[in-house]
Amino acid sequence: MANTWGYGAMTNHLGDIQNAKSIFIVGANPAVNHPVGFRHFLKAKENNGAKLIVVDPRYTRTAAKADYFAQIRPGTDIPFMYGMMNLIFENGWEDKKFIDDRTYGIDEIRKEAAKWTPEVVEDVTGVPAATLKEITEVYAKNRPGSVVWAMGLTQHTIGSSNTRIAPILQLVLGNMGVSGGGCNILRGHDNVQGASDMANAPDSLPGYYAKNEATWKYFAKMWKVDYEWLQGNFIKPEWMFKPGFTLARWWAGVLDGKNGNDPVENAGDSLKALIVIGNGITSTAQQVKVQEGLDGLELLVLLDPFVNDAGVITNKKDGVYLLPAATQFETSGTVVATNRSGQWRSQVVEPLFESMPDHEILFELAKRLGYYDELTRTIRDSEDKIEWPEAATREIASIVKSIGLTGWTPERLKRHQANWDKFDEKTLMGKEGTEVAGEYYGLPWPCWTEKHPGSPNLYDISRPVMQGGMGFRNRFGLEHNGVNQLAADGSAPVGGAQSGGYPEIKKDNIEKILGIKLTDEESEKMGATWATDGSGIIAEKCMEKGIAPYGNARARAVVWTFVDQIPQHREPLHTPRQDLAQKYPSFEDKPNHYRVFTKYKSLQLSKDFSKEFPINLTTGRLVNFSGAGMETRASMYLSRITPEMFADIHPELAAKHGIKNWDFVWIHSPEGTKIKVRARVVPSVKLDTIFLPFHWAGYMQGIDMTGNFPEGTKPYAVGESANTVANYGYDIVTQIPETKSGLCRIEKA
């Protein structure tokens, strides 16, 4: 999404879904994965007559609440949505004015969509043409419509294309920048958005700043450290600007291309140490490779309130340390919700026993590594003390201009926490006559200044900027192929100094665009751009003139820096339709993809995997467990609901293999790996597909490894990880693993 209109975050919010007239859920199961948030979907149905549409390989609990359901083959979401747009264009249901005024490149989409007739879509996706037609007409005629997705769209080799085709569908229908519309990504946990915002990714700095010399120097200035000192922490200066390893493939850095593993480029050295902070290691694919990577480390450190799976599945006998970390109830600070809202959390109890909050452990590490002074320089007071976490919140707000965290203060967020009941759940607006009147709950970013109320719905030009309005971000230049990339006249937030598109605000254009004259003092203090203006003057001046600092551009359907400039269907690496792999092949292999050589077409076309592994494999979640399950499987009551790992298998497929309900079965993958699990025989999956929940750990390929748990820490529920048999495959842009589509074979154990 960030490459479509500037930000890669949920555009609206859960309460706003109640304003939708139709809800298109593709690659998500909110009834199970977001059960509290799902009540907003049900209220939209009950109170607003919204039509609920679900597209999924399984008949899920969300599908059980749907008005319309399509059971799709895993990995074919792009053909389905192109099929929808084929019908939309054919029937003239598109929003022509929105397309003309606020988008670029839809003509290219129109050409591609013409190829995806209902009959072609049926052949590729398995969804009957009549079902596609019915769903498309309902969605097109019931606007505003909201598109909702989660990991079901992203965890594919073409995940980045999936998350572009859904926004393009919304642009075609004019469902963006309106209440009840938008692209509403459901994050897996409450602070996934906050973790993303703070750069828990290897290719950017906090706030999604690119790793280039200008931004590193900006951060050095704001952190009050020497740029040369920062640079000196890298083995060579150029490594300062390179992406690191991803969570999905860190282990490749340990294996270092040896014994047939994919080659790596890591300055001529292998990874020696790993620190795992609150991340379930079994939540990523290729667990046998993860295990090999763990075994090859010299040092493994785990920060967790519970025993991390990494310490259990490894065969290491030394060099493994478990540091007891405090839970969220034993510390305080901010998290960022799925809708970009900040939430303050207060400490409930002091850390128990010898546990410590994460930040204290990391401060101790920084002291021993010799850079505690630099790390804390801007958050220590005159007496060398740190007011935690308030000082950290202020530091973040002062630096991260790019997503507009500038308006967040501890005082504002605490006030919202104390008055959470005084906000309207559908609009997030503070109620009249209260101390939070005029502000949106959690100050959803961008919150440009301390007087700004936050932005509940992104890209809404019907509101003034000082009420959360904005156009699409100007992030991709002023023109492409001779076409102006700025929004048309009349497509700007109401009440602003500009009536149409304008570029992002910089020191050298602010006077012209805003129609102001800067003082010499303001010019001297001001940074070069709105995103690197440490003085805050650009944002303040923009608010006075009703201008969003990041500009007002067109959303683009064509991403000219991507391999696929418009989304293209490419078959999964392990596809049951080798005939379609020849027609819609994967990408060319990609060297140095986050430092690791990554196979695509060479693997996909090397053989017809479906002859030996004829069954589709997809993975997902359960309502009673979370993530890798370290915490939730330690609950006796939650574990009683699903005490053993299982596979959902269709009754006919089970009968074909002589399998009865709750028999043990072996599941084999093309990687040569296997798991032993129970069979749950249910009709919710198709005859050619099995489903695996991924919350278990403690067994590896039939081997009991629970003896590695320290005494008294073994969870109530243990079992095989689904990700032991998840197939090789990684997104071409992000390297997220392809866990939602793969192949396997089954046999009775």
Where are these regions (language model features)?
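Cofactor-pocket helix-loop regions in the catalytic cores of large enzyme subunits
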Residues: 1-191, 195-200, 219-475, 486-496, ...
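Surface-exposed flexible segments
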Residues: 161-168, 627-639
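Extracellular hydrolytic enzyme modules, especially secreted metalloproteases
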Residues: 209-212, 709
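Loop-to-helix "switch" segment enriched in basic
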Residues: 212-219
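Long, low-complexity, polar/charged, intrinsically disordered or flexibly structured peripheral segments
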Residues: 225-262, 464-604, 608
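Long, contiguous, secondary-structure-rich segments that constitute the structural scaffold
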Residues: 358-418, 497, 507-513, 517-525, ...
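N-terminal intrinsically disordered, low-complexity segments enriched in P/E/S/T
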Residues: 613-615, 625-627
